[in-house]
Amino acid sequence: MTLEKIIEKLAAKSSILISPITVKENLAYKVEPNFLLPFLKALKESEELRFTVLTDLFGSDFPEKAKRFEVVYNLLSLKLNKRLIIKTYVSEHESIPSAMSIFNATCWYEREVYDMFGINFDGNDDKRRILTDYEFEGHPLRKDFPLTGYTQVKYDEQTKKVAYEPVNLDIEYREFDFSSPWHSPTYTLPGDEKAK
């Protein structure tokens, strides 16, 4: 029996709805958030599969979709020497159940996804920032987060403290909207006339 058939049989046995998806040459499945934990647990505890290692957990933002956030779990079976990708999708105001009860390494991954995207994981109450500063506003990997951010951090020599100030750009913001890296824009930017 193929690996795909074993996984689909395991999901059907537990009444878990999964959909196979294509992610290059990798074996991958899409699952709704309410089926995520039962599916991860079944994959880990199955004697045939033994997907016991969570190698990565990350998020992506697709603001044009109703469920804009994609959360991806990469699993490894040392027994089979196979990898498996599990994807789930949530909207901005939904949360995902935390997988901390299944994989010990999940806490830091979930903190990173929360820090970068603002995706909440039910059952993980540790909302401390892990990559950004504690006073940081927003979630920087969201597509609607401004490129320059909201504040800049500087060390103030007079007060001998870190100071948060509004962003002040010393140069004018330029729009790079080339249709291709091989074509120049059709308009003239200030200063370009000197090159002619």
Curated annotation (Swiss-Prot):
Family statement drawn from the similarity comment of this UniProt entry: Belongs to the complex I 30 kDa subunit family.
What is this protein identified as?
NADH-quinone oxidoreductase subunit C
Write down the SUPFAM superfamilies for this protein, in alphabetical order: Nqo5-like
Where is the protein situated, by its record's location annotation? Cell inner membrane
**EC numbers:** 7.1.1.-
Q: From which organism does this entry originate?
A: Rickettsia bellii (strain RML369-C)
Q: What keywords were assigned to this record?
A: Cell inner membrane, Cell membrane, Membrane, NAD, Quinone, Translocase, Transport, Ubiquinone
Membrane disposition: Peripheral membrane protein
Question: What is the recorded function of this protein according to its Swiss-Prot or TrEMBL entry?
Answer: NDH-1 shuttles electrons from NADH, via FMN and iron-sulfur (Fe-S) centers, to quinones in the respiratory chain. The immediate electron acceptor for the enzyme in this species is believed to be ubiquinone. Couples the redox reaction to proton translocation (for every two electrons transferred, four hydrogen ions are translocated across the cytoplasmic membrane), and thus conserves the redox energy in a proton gradient.
